[in-house]
């Protein structure tokens, strides 16, 4: 802001110098005009002097003519012998001569007075104008000198301010570089933190899955124990042998976390009965399909053979109505003894080849009768996972 103010002042001073130069040029032109007028008046004075000389010569000539006429008249009067006539003509001639001389003297005096007055007036006007122009020119020179000094000071100050501005700009640039470095460091730290968080979440998810598998195993074992106990007690018929692979999960109506108990159900509780049936025609099987629709887990059970399952399709049908289809990426290979989890959109992290994400759906669907079937590229069924659930209230 201070630099802009100084620049504006410099511009104003330069405009003032330009204006004063214009005024000085105008005054110089006026002085030259006055000098030209003086020269013209001098020429006029010389012309008038010449005219005066001509008039004086004419007067002298007329005087000589008149003198000659007077001489002739005197001669004529001298020839007149009458004293009265001579005296009369002499008196008349003297009177005429006086009148003529008085008239010419008056004319000469008037012309001389007029010429002297006119020339004095013109000379005084020229002197006054010249003095005024000299004063104005002197003032303009002093003003130009003062403005030059002020302009020099402002230029020096402007140079100092520009130096300071350059230094500040350099410091600003260095600070910007430092800020960019700090931002990159901060982003790198954030990325590291996010990577650690993702890793911890994945580990937590793996632990949760392992815990869920243990709970499922425990529930299955508890159910089998309960079935055997009932069979031993005679409370179940022999058809119960088909339920060895069934999972019995009892859930209180006010509790979100499932609890595993025996098949006995108390009054006022909700019992949920879920059975799973899995089959596979080869090494690739559907190991698990989340009942909440979050993921589907496929596994290569062979310990040494890779299974190329690129473009294979997982078809999931919910309650015989809605159908969801997921296609594996082209050239996807499932390693021996490895599994791949396909997450619904927003439910897990994309980390191939162990974890994939189905971007088309945010859930694989929830229902009481859910069939998940794996087809190869030729449309042949290679594996299936069937889930059936029933709920009773006592």
Swiss-Prot record:
Domain LTD: 272-389
Pfam families in alphabetical order: Filament
Presence of the UniProt keyword Transmembrane helix in the record: no
InterPro entries given in the database record: IF_conserved, IF_rod_dom, Lamin_tail_dom, Lamin_tail_dom_sf
SUPFAM superfamilies from the UniProt entry: Intermediate filament protein, coiled coil region, Lamin A/C globular tail domain
Region (Coil 2) location: 92-239
Region span, Linker 12: 74-91
Region ranges (Tail): 240-394
Keywords: Coiled coil, Intermediate filament
GO cellular component, one term: nuclear envelope
Organism superkingdom: Eukaryota
A molecular-function term among this protein's GO annotations: structural constituent of cytoskeleton
IF rod domain boundaries: 1-239
GO BP terms: heterochromatin formation; nuclear envelope organization; nuclear migration; nuclear pore localization; protein localization to nuclear envelope
SMART domains with a match to the protein in the record: Filament
Annotated region described as Coil 1B, given as residue ranges: 1-73
Keyword presence, Coiled coil: yes
Family, as annotated: Belongs to the intermediate filament family.
Stated name of the protein: Muscle cell intermediate filament protein AV71
Species: Acanthocheilonema viteae (Filarial nematode worm)
